[in-house]
């Protein structure tokens, strides 16, 4: 059974999310739990934000490990915390460091 991962970062890093997803899927045959980066941009309402947050945290819960691409937004830090609380490995990616 392949391992599952979730990628956390800020919305403006969508290209990096896609790159990480392709790399992990093609080279390791791992599966992404929730691919928020390919979701269409929607009008942001409170109900949309709540539904997105729930899906993203479920993605973290369902993952075997989390990849965090820095810098991230506030949600990235929440997702890292959720992974750590459940003893999931967290891999930090710092492009251009």
Q: What role is predicted for each listed range?
A:
Residues 1-97:
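Conserved catalytic or regulatory cores that recognize and/or transform ribose-phosphate-containing ligands
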């Amino acid at each position: 059974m392949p391992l599952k991962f979730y990628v956390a970062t800020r919305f403006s890093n969508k290209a990096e999310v896609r790159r990480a997803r392709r790399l992990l899927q093609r080279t390791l045959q791992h599966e992404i739990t929730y691919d928020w980066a390919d979701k269409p941009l929607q009008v942001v309402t409170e109900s949309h934000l709540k539904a997105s947050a729930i899906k993203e945290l479920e993605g973290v819960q369902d993952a075997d490990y989390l990849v965090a691409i820095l810098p991230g937004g506030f949600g990235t830090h929440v997702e890292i915390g959720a992974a750590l609380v459940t003893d999931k490995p967290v891999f930090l990616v710092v492009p251009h460091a």
